[in-house]
A protein has these predicted regions:
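Nucleic-acid nuclease catalytic cores
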Residues: 65-90, 94-230
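Charged, glycine-rich intrinsically disordered N-terminal tails and low-complexity linkers that flank
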Residues: 1-54, 58, 145
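Residue-level signal for secondary-structure boundary elements
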Residues: 36, 40, 226-232
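Acidic/proline-rich low-complexity IDRs
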Residues: 14-15, 23-26, 42, 103, ...
């Protein structure tokens, strides 16, 4: 029911026109429909979805150990106070002052809450990631060889498409926009995506800078879209 009352992070890529699976029109109709459709009810039965739900606590535990950061999972769906048509629930939230094992970018960012999005990539889905630009990879060249890499430069001000920015960070565009909505909710300077690759049972962590341009577009497109939902 809460998901019907606004646009969550998983809706962000649809609002911005970069979701390859769902159109904006389909999303608007879904939001205007009070009850879950049969198709939506079946989503929870999919093996990939059940696997993701079951593995989420394990991935949070592994990411917490890798980063030396306490990561908690908030239990509720939250509403943006200034933008009530936007909602947010979090897979994980960490606090930067507790980071011990990882080189974070700026001392001024200490004490900030940051989103840590959790994903499981199937063997088919992992082609959408580039672990060679991840800030941490558990397996490299097929061997267990935990490796850290420098944080990528901030490209949020570059005149790039969302797809190009997502490719730069090594993640799918629909998770780039989701992370941006999560960062906006927390006023976070950056966020992380912790991914377990099903094929070799390894975790990679991707670092993404805040993108004000994309966040502003989410506010505008979300408002416009919600007006259309209310008119349906």
């Amino acid at each position: 029911k809460a998901r019907r009352n606004g646009f969550g992070g998983s809706d962000s890529s649809i609002l911005l026109g970069v979701n390859p699976f769902t159109t904006l029109r389909q999303l608007l109709i879904q939001k205007a429909t009070p009850e879950l459709t049969e198709e939506e009810k079946q989503v929870g039965q999919l093996a990939a979805v059940r696997k993701g739900n079951d593995l989420e606590p394990l991935i949070i535990q592994k990411a917490s150990k890798i980063l030396g950061m306490e990561i908690v999972k908030p239990p509720h769906m939250y509403m943006f106070q200034d933008f009530p048509y936007l909602k947010m629930n979090f897979d994980g939230v960490g606090k930067t002052e507790k980071v011990e094992n990882f080189q974070l970018p700026e001392a001024s960012d200490l004490g900030k809450y940051i989103p840590v999005e959790i994903k499981v990539a199937t063997e088919k889905g992992q082609r959408h990631y580039n672990p060679f630009v991840a800030v941490y990879s558990e397996v490299v060249a097929g061997k267990l060889n935990p490796t850290t890499r420098p944080i990528l430069a901030d490209v949020s001000n570059m005149d790039w498409t969302i797809e190009k920015k997502a490719e730069y960070y090594g993640i799918p565009q629909y998770y780039y926009t989701q992370l941006q909505q999560e960062m906006m909710a927390l006023d976070a300077p950056y966020g992380m995506l912790a991914v377990m690759f099903d094929a070799d049972w390894s975790v990679s962590i991707f670092f993404v800078w805040r993108d004000i341009k994309v966040q502003n577009r989410l506010k505008i497109e979300g408002f416009t879209a919600w007006q259309k939902v209310e008119d349906l």
